[in-house]
Amino acid sequence: MKVLIANLDTPNYIKAMSHFGAECVNTREIPESIEEYDALILPGGDDIDPVFFHQEMNGSRDIDHELDVTQLTLCRRFAEEGKPILGICKGAQVINVCFGGDIIQDLPDGKREHHSYHQGRGTGEYHETDIVPGSFLAKLYGEHVVTNSYHHQAIGKVGEGLEVLQKSDDGVIEFMAHRSLPIYAVQWHPEKNCWDTAKEGVADGEPLFTYFAEKIRNGK
């Protein structure tokens, strides 16, 4: 399988997909054709330019407009082809914006501390989440699971066709899946906690990456 990762310098994502023999290609450019690629990963990163969801700047920072164009374009093209997409953290927000949703540009006090990356010590937070019973995600993790958290923004209005499957204990959306396409948007970071880096008591990314790899192999 050949996976396009829409940014440079993503060793954790490459390492995770290497468990399935995937060839990963990093890019900040829009290729002429996506025919050779089986799937797309939209990785974590800086904030999305709010122009893409029709808002003024209101707490967003570290904008990379050029990369946003690449990621949103690739998301649309892979979705049009029905190819699997996995968006993580910012990537989940890119998926939401691609389908017409918007972003909470800066979580309010209290929630922000519950979810944010701490730049001074290089760590994130951990919190309880609830998963929709009977969903494929519940089959992977159960209905209640602790996840890591490294973000100050969050999904606001949910994009068309996307279904919320997981929320944190304070109501922040943590996972969405498209109702008819193999598209998965996860706000937490499975690539930071999987296989040899897995932390006991915290959601292990391995089941999610395995599920995604199976979707790639099945072509849907």
Where are these regions (language model features)?
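Catalytic cores of DNA base-excision repair glycosylases
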Residues: 142-144
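Short beta-strand
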Residues: 147, 166-167
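Cytosolic ligand/metal-binding cores
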Residues: 93
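Conserved G/P- and acidic residue-centered "switch" motifs that form tight phosphate/ATP-binding loops
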Residues: 89
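N-terminal beta1-alpha1 cap of cysteine-dependent amidohydrolase-like domains
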Residues: 1-86, 96-104, 108-136, 140, ...
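Short catalytic/ligand-gating loop segments at beta-alpha or beta-beta junctions
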Residues: 147-152, 176
